[in-house]
Amino acid sequence: MIETDKFSAPDRVISATPASSREEAFERALRPKLLDEYVGQEKVRGQLDIFMHAARNRREALDHVLLFGPPGLGKTTLAHIIAREMGVNLRQTSGPVLERPGDLAALLTNLEANDVLFIDEIHRLSPVVEEILYPALEDYQIDIMIGEGPAARSVKLDLQPFTLVGATTRAGMLTNPLRDRFGIVARLEFYTAEELARIVTRSAQLLGAHIDPLGSLEIARRARGTPRIANRLLRRVRDYAEVKGDGTITREIADAALAMLDVDRVGFDLMDRKLLEAVLHKFGGGPVGVDNLAAAIGEERDTIEDVLEPYLIQQGYLQRTPRGRVATAAAYRHFGLASPQAGDSGDLIDGE
């Protein structure tokens, strides 16, 4: 059984990014170990199952894999599953950590045959490190410089065959040469409420929590299509159920706990409402540029683009147009406001 501290929620309970190393440890404990245990992403799972099966039959390293999509959808989990299904070791790092070519060279030269190297935030690799990676991906070789000044010389080192699994939330920031070296490219999509309910039920069992189907579904509906958020909400609702109820998570208990956390029925929290209200009230529904919007709500541009916007756009509350962000009719309805006339909104989204 996995224990959690009472009411130790992160500042933004529906953030899709891990709040601390301790939360990452909880995630690892709840993480499915095999592809058959992995819920959702049916298309990606089906593709990986075939590609891994073929690579195992040929006793080869799996082709290099690029996983992209919003945070919290299971990219790291899939990297661990790939290594386990292939029966090999996994080495994990991230783009910002690999500051010098020697950092990457040390990782690559220590890989055993067919091992998996997982690089999270791969779009943040420095250009000089990325250059070292190209021959490693294509030919399983790296060039390193020995010595300094006029006496320096390049030495080519052979590597064991390996699989690079790269993960990113910003696929558009990858350079074309790097993107082209991945043989398998998969986009992870937001999960349905039914898929998330299955994940919540499974996680509750691992946590030793009692939950009924309607309780699972209530949490799932407010989890913004993201397993990481669903598991975080589950832990907070479990705390509430133990203190305010008999420990069983019902729909009513889940609703009360999530209301306490200020997560509404469509999964919006204060930050989501702040963003939408800024578009509606400060900028007349839009269009508004992302930099102006970031200044208006006191957030970083990257936070808006990577964390806040994807769910709002996917759910149809916000549009991204060439002229800026525009609130949709659904956003007006959510706040009980009258929508603008069709002619006015048509001018705003001209060119879409």
Swiss-Prot record:
It is found in: Cytoplasm. Its main location: cytoplasm. Mg(2+) binds at T76. CDD domains: AAA. GO terms for cellular component: cytoplasm; Holliday junction resolvase complex. Residues 265-352 are annotated as: Head domain (RuvB-H). InterPro entries: AAA+_ATPase, AAA_lid_4, DNA_helicase_Holl-junc_RuvB, P-loop_NTPase, RuvB-like_N, RuvB_C, WH-like_DNA-bd_sf, WH_DNA-bd_sf. The keyword DNA-binding applies. It catalyses: ATP + H2O = ADP + phosphate + H(+). GO terms for biological process: DNA recombination; DNA repair. Has 3 domains, the large (RuvB-L) and small ATPase (RuvB-S) domains and the C-terminal head (RuvB-H) domain. The head domain binds DNA, while the ATPase domains jointly bind ATP, ADP or are empty depending on the state of the subunit in the translocation cycle. During a single DNA translocation step the structure of each domain remains the same, but their relative positions change. Belongs to the RuvB family. The RuvA-RuvB-RuvC complex processes Holliday junction (HJ) DNA during genetic recombination and DNA repair, while the RuvA-RuvB complex plays an important role in the rescue of blocked DNA replication forks via replication fork reversal (RFR). RuvA specifically binds to HJ cruciform DNA, conferring on it an open structure. The RuvB hexamer acts as an ATP-dependent pump, pulling dsDNA into and through the RuvAB complex. RuvB forms 2 homohexamers on either side of HJ DNA bound by 1 or 2 RuvA tetramers; 4 subunits per hexamer contact DNA at a time. This is Holliday junction branch migration complex subunit RuvB. It comes from Cupriavidus pinatubonensis (strain JMP 134 / LMG 1197) (Cupriavidus necator (strain JMP 134)).
